[in-house]
Curated annotation (Swiss-Prot):
Protein family membership: Belongs to the BZW family.
Name used for this protein in its record: eIF5-mimic protein 2
Keyword Heme: no
Residue ranges constituting the W2 domain according to the UniProt record: 247-414
GO cellular component labels: cytoplasm; membrane
Biological source species: Xenopus laevis
Amino acid sequence: MNNQKQQKPTLSGQRFKTRKRDEKERFDPTQFQDCIIQGLNETGNDLEAVAKFLDASGAKLDYRRYAETLFDILVAGGMLAPGGTLADEVIRTDVCVFSAQEDLETMQAFAQVFNKLIRRYKYLEKGFEEEVKKLLLFLKGFSESERNKLAMLTGILLANGNLSASILNSLYNENLVKEGVSAAFAVKLFKSWINEKDINAVAGSLRKVNMDNRLMELFPANKQTVEHFTKYYTDAGLKELAEYVRNQQTIGARKEIHKELQEMISRGEAHKEISVYVKDEMKKNNISEQTVIGILWSSIMSCVEWNKKEELVTEQAIKHLKQYSPLLAAFTTQGQSELTLLLKIQEYCYDNIHFMKSFQKIVVLFYKAEVLSEEPILKWYKDAHVAKGKSVFLEQMKKFVEWLKNAEEESESETEEGD
């Protein structure tokens, strides 16, 4: 048996044709940088010419492979070293964001350059988002002016939909937050974003990436209060953002109070303990009595399995609400709170069809228990009711309202006789 390896035949004198897709010239980052910078310098700061140059160069240069280098140059003028400084011994260009005028109009023009480039080469979208995330982490390595320009540009790009609001995650970096860089950067960013759109559009974008409740995290833990956030951004000229965050915090607090109240009621905790908890939360979150009475009503009504039979549910409701009347009375010390409760009862009885005949009996119970008084009931009947089930509930209340009016007249008559 021959153990020697059989020599494979060779093809001599053959020339293989390179595949077309492999013919594209391969550049290393330095060569790529040289080509881009040379082309940018030749445009002479004409951003229309810059956009055309970038459009044409994508057919010759490997944008996909060197996206980071490309965006480094367009923002900072050259390749960035870790930390945000320009890499040593590299050539640079002044045709970039950091060398441009620090004003909104100039940044809007640069935003158009990025917009055209990414629309032309869609595959750059992901690389561009990664670049912006990186740049935000490098903020400490940039000058104040460079940060301001980047903030304005980012705000415009967010408004135009060129970036997802998820890039803002980089601003929650511990060191950036601790040194106040994140909060200051966010001022310029949100100003330009709101200038392009409005606070509702901004809120919608933040909500999509679950950041609508995280804005206070731009500050260190010891400053993460509504008061501090509101003052900081109001003083910076962003009152609408401050109000938005205040409202978000209030909404969050309402949900927490509602959840806790349901649990306390289900556990059968004493009214005094529930009252103390609610009053503490009102003070802590600056929540009005009118808001709290609605939450309290909803919590009390949601912790019961109601009878499906209309003739039985009223009796069940009266029995349940009777024991909670003293608790409700503690949070109807103002006429507006009483009116709010009346509207909540009206809406509840309309939305839950088995309660349609219960409305008047609930109101009478609360009147006798001093949860509701004459004036708000009469006001509700006259013109403060809502459209839901209006005709049914007004008819139910007709006799009781007449009785209230007569009682009021008799009281006034007795007062006059006494005088």
